[in-house]
Curated annotation (Swiss-Prot):
Quaternary structure note: Part of the RNA polymerase complex.
Gene: rpo10
Name recorded for this polypeptide: DNA-directed RNA polymerase subunit Rpo10
Natural source organism: Methanospirillum hungatei JF-1 (strain ATCC 27890 / DSM 864 / NBRC 100397 / JF-1)
Broad EC category: transferase
One GO biological process term: DNA-templated transcription
Length: 62
């Protein structure tokens, strides 16, 4: 489950997650990706950098 807003400042970050994930999987530098996406605040950067997808692990327990 992708976080919709930054927990600290409330900025919408879900719009940047898919592109961040795609570019990170292509081995691009996370700093450059976040700079290009306009994620200037360190709290928002933290939200994207530390997010871990666990939805596939939770599906069997529905």
């Amino acid at each position: 489950m992708i976080p919709v807003r930054c927990f600290t400042c409330g900025k919408v970050i879900s719009t940047a997650y898919e592109e961040f994930k795609r570019r990170r999987d292509a081995s691009e530098d996370p700093k450059r990706i976040l700079d290009d996406l306009g994620m200037d605040r360190y709290c928002c950067r933290r939200m994207l950098l530390t997010h871990k997808e666990i939805i596939d692990e939770l599906n069997p327990y529905q």
